Amino acid sequence: MSLISAVEDRDIHNIGKTSGGGSRTSSITSSKKSLKHGSKSLRKPKVYQTTGELLSREALYKAKLKYGVYQSPAQSYSIGVSDAHAASDKAANLAHDNQTTVEAYKRMFIDPNATKAASKMGPKVVRNNSITSATSKTSKESQTKRKSKESPGAAASKAYSMTMETTSLSSQTNSRSYSITSASSVLSGASGSFNSTVNPKPKTLNLEKVLVGAEKKAESRIKERWEPEKTNFQYGVKTDEHGNLNQFSFSNEMMNNIMAKVDAPKAQDLQKVKKVSAEKEAKSMKFALGAANAVKDMHPGEDIDKSIALKAQKRETYLSQLTSQQVLTLARANVDRQLDIIEKSDMHRKLFTNMEYNKAAVAVAQSNHQKKTEFHNKINMGGGLFLSPEDITKIASGLISPVLGEVSERAEAQRAMDEEIAERTEAYNKSLNEWETMERSIISNDAKVLTTTANRHQTEKKTSQEKIKASFDALVARMDTKVAERETLLEDTKSKEIEFKKQMQQELKDEKARLDQDLEEWGKKCEQDITEARKEQEELLKPYHDDLANAEAEHKTLVEERDAINAEISRLQDAIVDHKRKISGYGNDLDAQKNRNIREDDKLLELGQTKESLESHLNDDVIILANKAKEQAELSTKEARLKQLEVDSLINERKSELNATDIELKKEKLSLLEAMKDVASARGDDKIDEEKVKKLIGMTSEEYLTQNKSVEKNVEDLPTQLEKIEEGDELKKEEIVGAETKNSGGDGVPVSTAAKEATETSSAVQTKEPEEKISIGNKSSGKEDANDCKSAEHSKEISVSQKAGNNKSLGVSPDSLEHTFSGFSQGSSIEDDQDAISNQEKK
């Protein structure tokens, strides 16, 4: 974890661009500007430790080295012009060409004719505006001063501000006249750009003031470069290590000595060297102490990143080179050589720095200027127009004052906004400081509370331990007295116990003899009761065992019938497939016979055969059709039989399930009765509680036995009824086959009627056969209803499902039988269609 938060890229960029002469106020103004524009709020880094104390300078220095924000000459940008030889000339040219007071309001797109007309009608045309009336002379002067201060790159305005400090009030009025003349020169230059035929006169220039300002500015820039101020970066704690980057202070005296190539005395050099060495020792001691304090919080076992170590080594070598005497001597020699080259190559220096020549030139210029009495104190506006400064001032006030008034209003509004933002930031910082103090107080209070509670707990613990010890001592004394009393009592009880044991042994012997005699008599009586109870239990449970054996036998017969039905179903399916194959063969024979008939018809037309031969061929066709109808009838009957067998198999499965449940129920009842018998025998009762049996089973044991006897008779009659039903089905099949053979073999009956009768008989067989089965099913269900209530409900469900299975075959064509059979084979239940079958029965 770092000691301070990382600096963002935009902050590093701003740090690199700050000049050496800047101070901490630049960071404050930049933060205010950022708040004013509302771009992003600067986040202050954490420069405090977790305990609330400030970080040391060594910690801040290491953190800056870590994040690469340490201010050094290698990271600072160059200030000033690119060519050092032409620095003074560049400053003079900038001061001459820069026109900050008029440039912002110059209108380049105005027609020159309109400018001439406005200048001629200047005194008459005056704009009355509330904004211009509100502005006073003092506000204008303050605006001009503020503009001259706010223009950062105007060397002339800075030189003008420097000269104002030394000149008197008359020079201030002259400087104002120069500003008006500069405005007029700009206006004349603009008009001259539009009208190239007029040659403007050369501009007047006070070279003395410009050169003095340029020299001062150049001197200040050189001083800033040689003695850069160590900035405090906008972040961290402010330190007092400013101005220690260089050992020498390049003052005016030093610069004069350098320019004059005069060496300093050796004694002064020795004194400076001693002073520097003493300062170095003090610094080294201070840094060693700081490093020792900083090393306490560091981990010596951790490895430093190679890149960071390499950067730190390069920075140390660079800083050591900056403070070495060899570098300084080489730099001084380079500066001397460069100054010599500048003096030799700079021809303008001989011209502009020669005061006598400049004075003579100024005197000549003034004499030439005084000769022009006609245009004295007037400005050439171009096109032969000369105006006085007062007229130009009026025209400029008419054009510029509204704009200046609006600018002043906006500036005042912006100023008020800046003040409000500053107040808000101050209030926010104040509240933040209060909150931080509150947090610190909370932390300290928490620590105090912890210490106080710990002390209180210790005191309470001591007092409670003392109380417990005292109570324990009292308890021990009290218990000792009780133990002594109990020991005496124990001795008395032991003596009494011995006497009581002797007495009880004698009583136990007598009681044991009496109990042995009673037990022998009671055992004989219990054996006699058990034999009698077992006989009664066997008599009562005999019908239940018989009922269970009959139910198991019935279940076995039903399973065998189901297997027989499944075998019959598989046989009928094979027969159906065989009949379908024969029908397809008969169809092919019919197609072949049709083709043969066509050929025979053609032959009859050609050869004229007799009628008998043709009828013989037609009789063959009729025989084939009869055989086809016969096979279709057999197929329909077998499909109906298959469907009925499917229904019977479902009924048998349901009956087997019902019998299984009945068997389980009877087993449970049997186990219940056996349990009740055991309970009664254990209690010594002769009979079972009949009321309890009636509550559990719904009837008494005698009623249950009589009912089970009737159920046994019905179970014995069931296989005889099934055999009768199967015999009736076989007789009906034989009758249908005989009728078909008679119809197919008759000579006098036509083929169409024979086929119709075969289909009708098959449908009649289909309708009669289920009706008889329904009646038989109803009879059997009626018998079962008379016997048992619970078995009646199951038998009703079976009879209804049987009716549903039989009624589904009523009025169904042979084509639809295969579909319904496939539905049954897929496992469709019969009970789901009971409502539809009941509606069909009503119809």
Curated annotation (Swiss-Prot):
Residues with PTM Phosphoserine: S2, S88, S130, S182, S401, S584, S710, S763, S775, S816, S828, S829, S838
A single GO BP: eisosome assembly
GO cellular component, one term: plasma membrane
Positions where Phosphothreonine occurs in the chain: T720
UniProt feature, compositional bias: Basic and acidic residues: 781-797
Keywords, alphabetical: Acetylation, Cell membrane, Membrane, Phosphoprotein
Residue ranges, compositional bias (Low complexity): 752-764
Compositionally skewed regions (Polar residues) per UniProt: 127-137, 163-174, 798-810
Feature: compositional bias, Basic residues: 33-44
Domain of life: Eukaryota
Membrane topology: Peripheral membrane protein
Predominant subcellular localization, coarse grouping: cytoplasm
Modified residues (N-acetylserine): S2
Alphabetical list of PANTHER family matching this protein: EISOSOME PROTEIN 1 (PTHR28298:SF1)
Family from the record: Belongs to the EIS1 family.
Name under which the protein is recorded: Eisosome protein 1
Species this chain originates from: Saccharomyces cerevisiae (strain Lalvin EC1118 / Prise de mousse)
Encoding gene (name): EIS1
